């Protein structure tokens, strides 16, 4: 339905109005039920055709407060001029915005939430800060060298014999050998001894005479077998506690080749699946003793060229042997000629008879060929 049922005249007639009940089929539209219950009211007077409605009239129920309190004359209300224009004063609608009922607390909120309190990071100690190792205080008897004296020693190195330098260099790897494996044992007494040893070695290195800068340094391109040997020759200490040294007593590992699990078959593999074996399509292939294919070809050739079959009929061979000449008389020669002519005529008659007899045979053969072709097509 184009109109809602509530606004139809048939539904509105229940209110006991004074409308004509014969006009029920016409969908009468009402804006208020009071128009039906109070009775028919006269329609509002419309303005002239020249005036254009820019504002609602006084009789309009939706005009709001403008119609009641407007003091302009009717001519000004119906005019289209700019000076007579007056904006509509619409009543403001009640806002649906909820009230702000939040009341901030006087005490400040805690920055650290309960989650942060429960899930704190673990108290992981610093690396190298072991509480079971007692920290050694520096001894007061150590001579403190001034910075100027250090610089002078760096620039002017004391001349020492080469034998003493070699002895100092030889002592270094021995001490390293002694302190290398002890770091792996977790006993506190051994760890304390390791710390003491390292401190002594560092003190020795600080007071050791440095080599002059003129000596050639071992680089990577010199082709030294091990970098550790080159460092030992130079006599420079490393920052690592345990310098890498390759193991000497370990035998080289022999590569073991695992046997392949796959064993290839000794016999020749037949590349034919079960599907190929079952679905070969042997009916289409001609067998050795089967002459069906040849016969079909012959039938097709006969169907296309049926004149070739008649040519296959053997013709009687005519003997054209010349008789021997006899010098006795002319009579036997004439007799021989007559015999040849008679034999030629007889052969012609036989050929005509054979051609007459072959015609019905050809018809029968052509019928058979047509039947076979029809069967082959089916």
From Swiss-Prot:
Family indicated by similarity: Belongs to the STOP family.
Where is this protein found?
A: Cytoplasm, Cytoskeleton
Basic residues composition bias: residue spans: 322-337
> Is-annotated flag, keyword Nuclease?
no
Kindly list the GO molecular function terms attached to this UniProt entry.
calmodulin binding; microtubule binding
Which lineage ranks, top first, belong to the organism behind this chain? Eukaryota, Metazoa, Chordata, Craniata, Vertebrata
TM ranges are: none
- Residue ranges, annotated region (Mn 3): 237-260
Point to the regions of Polar residues compositional bias: 52-62
Which GO terms of the cellular component aspect does the record hold? cytoplasm; microtubule
The identity of this protein, by name, is Microtubule-associated protein 6 homolog
Q: Keywords in UniProt for this one?
A: Cytoplasm, Cytoskeleton, Microtubule, Transport
Biological role: Involved in microtubule stabilization in many cell types, including neuronal cells. Specifically has microtubule cold stabilizing activity. Involved in dendrite morphogenesis and maintenance by regulating lysosomal trafficking.
| Extent of Basic and acidic residues compositional bias | 203-220, 242-252, 265-274, 306-315, 359-378
| Region named Mn 1 | 79-99
Keyword flag Flavoprotein: no
Q: Where is this region: Disordered?
A: 36-111, 203-378
Q: Which organism is it from?
A: Xenopus tropicalis
Q: Which GO terms describe its biological process?
A: dendrite morphogenesis; lysosome localization; microtubule cytoskeleton organization
Show the segment(s) annotated as Mn 2: 112-135
